[in-house]
């Protein structure tokens, strides 16, 4: 129930009562990304920093990765090597709406 309310909170209603575009920062928090990547995306012993990812990723590629990280990493030597440094695998977000994944991707790609 808590997860559902957190996810619904990521898509706030605007002044007209219609759903506004999801906030990437809110979706990041609601989906638990901070548990491994830190509340500010600086990384931890469970997941790499998310700062500076714009040099490696486009929005479309990052959304595809979030949907199927294991398969994506197998085809990318840089990700396969990075995966060896962390004990937890990247969670698959294939059930998360595309608009929310795109919002998270935009948020991550704008981290310095």
Label every model-predicted segment.
Residues 14-17, 42, 110-112:
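Inter-heme linker and motif-flanking segments adjacent to c-type heme-binding CXXCH motifs
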Residues 69, 90-91, 98-112:
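Thiol/selenol-based redox catalytic cores and closely related redox-interacting motifs
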Residues 1-9:
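Sec-dependent bacterial lipoprotein signal peptides
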Residues 24, 30-39, 62, 104-108:
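The canonical Cys-X-X-Cys-His
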Residues 10-29:
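Electrostatic cytochrome c docking/interface patches
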Residues 21-25, 38-71, 87-95:
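Gly/Gly-Pro-rich "capping" loops immediately C-terminal to redox-active cysteine motifs
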Residues 11, 33-36, 90:
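Disulfide-bonded cysteines in secreted/extracellular proteins and peptides
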Residues 71-77:
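Proline-centered turn/helix-capping motifs that create local helix->coil transitions or kinks
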């Amino acid at each position: 129930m808590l997860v559902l309310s957190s996810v619904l909170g990521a898509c706030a209603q605007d002044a007209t009562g219609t759903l506004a575009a999801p906030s990437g920062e809110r979706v990041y928090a609601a989906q638990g990304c901070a548990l491994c990547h830190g509340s500010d995306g600086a990384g931890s012993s469970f997941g790499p920093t998310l700062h500076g990812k714009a040099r490696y990723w486009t929005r479309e590629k990052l959304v595809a990765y979030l949907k199927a990280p294991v398969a994506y990493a197998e085809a990318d030597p840089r990700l396969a090597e990075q995966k060896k440094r962390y004990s937890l695998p990247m969670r698959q977000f294939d059930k998360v709406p595309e608009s929310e994944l795109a919002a998270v991707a935009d948020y991550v790609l704008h981290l310095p």
